[in-house]
């Protein structure tokens, strides 16, 4: 029997999503205006929870559509305004440029990265050592590149490995065209494929946590670090030194956690690379080496030189992150002969849906600001003093960063603390310590969920996640040991007085200097 127009509309709404999910989104859209009329504050928090729900269900339906509908309705009923949404996007333009250009730029360095990581994987047989290498390499790269860039690299590498194996296991040779997303059980060894998926999940999670370990250390590591450094008037070196009493112990604790979960096969870790898969990857490596022409070698050299420019440009902040990304695209494509528009377009496919999703997120951020959802938490935290205040800010930041975007959380908190400094509620030295607590609080506990770490959300919504069966719940479970260890070590470094003692030592050694409140007043309250 043919469908009625109404049934057809419902069938088309959110496509292949489950019926219960469609009903849930429709009920949210029906309830929100009523709630907003009754109590705007509660309606604001309900909207945030609903948006988090759409992110949690990312594998049922890409969050752009349901989240976007909720955001559009929020603007229509007056929870926020189009002006506020535009202001949020303008304030975070660097983050959007980063997604559009930097992720695409890395696409053109894929051959070099695949070469480096393939060597790492085929030459090192110990799973524990490979895991630690991936974690440390991600941390190092994240100190200079944005975490999203690093995760984009690792995703590229993993998709490369997966497609090579899938191609050979499906009975084709290395040079054949092949759709690695197809499921062909008659040719693929299911248990072997499952082990390989587990292995890739492990490596991606270690790498994802590595990006958080490295990203917290420097002012270019994460977008919110740049905002915090600007408000505190810190340069690259001073930022790294001030963070080190928390970031150095946390880094070593993170690497130790990587070793322990692999050694004891806890939380879904410890999946071994099947021998047959290792053989295929090794053969592919030898095959690639044998057929590498002088032109191919020059391409690798160009990509390596562009990689050096990328790290130098970011470390010394020679231009905004997105513009450096654009220069990476231009240099790589110009010198490696990629001039076809279609070939250029493929580089932008991975990041643009996520860029649109982030723009929708800024609409929700607009609601949080207009409805002052965070105000009670901030006033409560400022009512304490000394180390207790630092710990509370760290925990409050951490909890909110687990469920909200950490760029937003960091920006809101640093601006509130800046206002407290200018009002004379806290001293300049306490402000500097609070800036450390805010930066570490937004970066470390936020590994708990994909909502907190943009890199994790990017991984979850990538084309790779369904291939290796990486769901939201599995991601949270695998991140759990890291969440616990990083959060606790961070708290101990602050609560024990180690942060304040080391900061005093840095002052005494003239590694850093005291700043003044007047200096802070000179820097207008920016961001939000």
Curated annotation (Swiss-Prot):
It is found in: Cell inner membrane. The keyword GTP-binding does not apply. The chain crosses the membrane at residues 23-45, 66-86, 95-115, 130-164, 203-223, 241-261, 310-330, 349-369, 390-410, 448-468, 475-495. The keyword Glycosyltransferase does not apply. It is a multi-pass membrane protein. GO terms for cellular component: plasma membrane. It holds the Pfam family NhaB. GO terms for molecular function: sodium:proton antiporter activity. It catalyses: 2 Na(+)(in) + 3 H(+)(out) = 2 Na(+)(out) + 3 H(+)(in). Keywords: Antiport, Cell inner membrane, Cell membrane, Ion transport, Membrane, Sodium, Sodium transport, Transmembrane, Transmembrane helix, Transport. InterPro entries: Na+/H+_antiporter_NhaB (IPR004671). NCBIfam families: NhaB, PRK09547.1. Na(+)/H(+) antiporter that extrudes sodium in exchange for external protons. Belongs to the NhaB Na(+)/H(+) (TC 2.A.34) antiporter family. This is Na(+)/H(+) antiporter NhaB. It comes from Shewanella amazonensis (strain ATCC BAA-1098 / SB2B).
